UniProtKB/Swiss-Prot annotation:
NCBIfam families with a match to the protein in the record: D_Ser_am_lyase, PRK02991.1
Disulfide bonds: none
Protein's name in the database: Probable D-serine dehydratase
Similarity comment text for this entry: Belongs to the serine/threonine dehydratase family. DsdA subfamily.
Keyword Lyase appears in the UniProt entry: yes
Cofactor(s) for this UniProt protein: pyridoxal 5'-phosphate
Length: 446
């Protein structure tokens, strides 16, 4: 366990003790709706990311045969989840309609990290190719898969620090274009993720420390290595905008499903949060489209609520979960982050409705509930947000939020973001299910 000698004041006053108890809780953001920072990315920046991903679709279809049927689009289904709602005993007459956003099924990388990771590597490839005269600004992006481009990219190294899924997305995309790729992985990273990267020719450097140490090691390598690009999960605008670009497609999916989003038909989006880049980007993109009619809540482990801690402490100085006596140890490897993104937390101070925490036992119970109700197999991190809708009616804080915003939950739409799982080996899924059933049996016997 790592601690720093530091006095931390959190709001409300009883929050520190509640966090240290490691009992799940819902924290509401008292600053939600405050003005965004003056340097916050605007709609134009999101539109630029959308345009980049669109013009690279033919390239993606050429690089990855599995994208042929989608013409190179990196998108996931929006799956109705009424059965899950019933499994969790949350009736539709008090909770509206439920959907699962299936980023666990995103092609190639199998997780939400494909959105930001692919976008950043594509932006880098465009920049290098244009700089060296291989690509015109309006040119066909399939030139980035040419022998000349690959030769140029081979002289460059893409470096990232990760607990797993971002490393997978960066490593796969970079190696597909011919870049040298190095992924620094924390002690939380699963062995199968390391093996999958190595099979792609990616160099994996393993660290005994946590996520922050892996990121720091990657940053140090990039600082000392010529022609290298560091993908900074803690502060990359390119990653952030790649995630934000997902909002427009979700809006189209909701419209296709007949779900309105307006003053009388609120949208609730529940997203697992690690360092904050992916959920923060999605929240930013959705707020740009729907404004006050969308309510975004993050899900964090009871041992690693880094965004909650940073926002509750204020933005004056960085505060980590170690500073409040937590150990950052969780089965949710993708969420095992001690310090929230310095890029994202100031934005979330304005945009985020709240954060709810989840125990490892709940992760597995929710993973099992999703599998029973829908047949979808998730990794533990991806199941973190499943309990989000229930907090709104089963907790005093949630009921207060609904009352203060004059929300009729019967008219609401809930999107639970499933962030990863389709690439998990079958034996790992069997282990998840077995552990979940054992926990359920133990709970029933107490």
């Amino acid at each position: 366990m790592r601690y720093r000698s530091m006095t931390v004041t959190l709001q409300p006053a009883d929050l520190l003790a509640r966090l240290q108890s490691r009992h799940p809780l819902l924290w509401l953001n008292p600053h939600a709706g405050s003005p965004l920072p003056h340097d916050a990315p605007g709609p134009g920046a999101i539109a630029t990311a959308e345009a980049r991903l669109a013009r690279c679709e033919p390239l993606m279809a050429e690089l990855f045969p599995e994208l042929a049927t989608s013409a190179g689009k990196i998108e996931s289904p929006l799956m109705p989840a009424d059965n899950l709602q019933r499994t969790l005993s949350l009736p539709a007459d008090t909770h509206g309609a439920w959907f699962i956003k299936r980023d666990d099924a995103l092609p190639i990388a199998g997780s939400i990290k494909a959105r930001g990771g692919f976008h950043e590597v594509l932006a880098l490839a465009e920049s290098i190719a244009i700089e060296h005269g291989l690509l015109e600004p309006a040119g066909d992006r399939r030139i980035l898969a040419s022998a000349a481009a690959r030769e140029r990219f081979a002289a460059h190294t893409v470096i990232v620090g990760s607990t797993g899924n971002l490393g997978l997305s960066i490593g796969v995309m970079a190696s597909a274009l011919g870049f040298e790729s190095v992924v620094h992985m924390s002690t939380d990273a699963k062995p199968w993720k390391k093996a999958r990267l190595r099979q792609r020719g990616v160099r994996v450097i393993e660290h005994d420390g946590d996520y922050a140490q892996a990121v720091a090691a990657g940053r140090a390598q990039a600082r000392n290595q010529p022609r290298s690009h560091f993908v900074d999960d803690e502060g990359s605008l390119m990653l952030f905008l790649g995630y934000a670009a997902s909002a427009r497609h979700l809006a189209a999916q909701l419209a296709e499903a007949g779900r309105r989003v307006d003053a009388t038909h609120p949208l609730f989006v529940h997203i697992p949060c690690g360092v904050g880049g992916a959920p923060g980007g999605i929240a930013h993109g959705l707020k740009a489209l729907f404004g006050e009619h969308v309510h975004c809540f993050f899900a964090e482990p009871v041992a690693s609520p880094c965004m909650l801690v940073q926002l509750a402490a204020g933005l004056g100085k960085p505060v980590s979960v170690y500073d409040v006596g937590l150990d950052n140890r969780t089965e949710a490897d993708g969420l095992a982050v001690a310090q929230a993104s310095h890029l994202v937390s100031p934005l979330m101070a304005s945009l985020l409705s709240g954060v709810f925490t989840v125990s490892d036992a709940q992760l597995y119970a929710q993973l099992l509930a999703v599998q029973h109700a829908t047949g979808v197999e998730l990794e533990p991190s991806a199941a973190a947000a499943v309990g989000g809708p229930g907090w709104l009616t089963r907790s005093p804080a949630g009921r207060d939020y609904v009352h203060r915003h004059a929300i009729d939950l019967r008219q609401s739409t809930h999107v639970i973001w499933a962030t990863g799982g389709s690439l998990v080996p079958p034996e790992e899924h069997r282990r998840f299910q077995s552990h979940a059933k054992a926990l359920a049996g133990a709970a029933a016997g107490t």
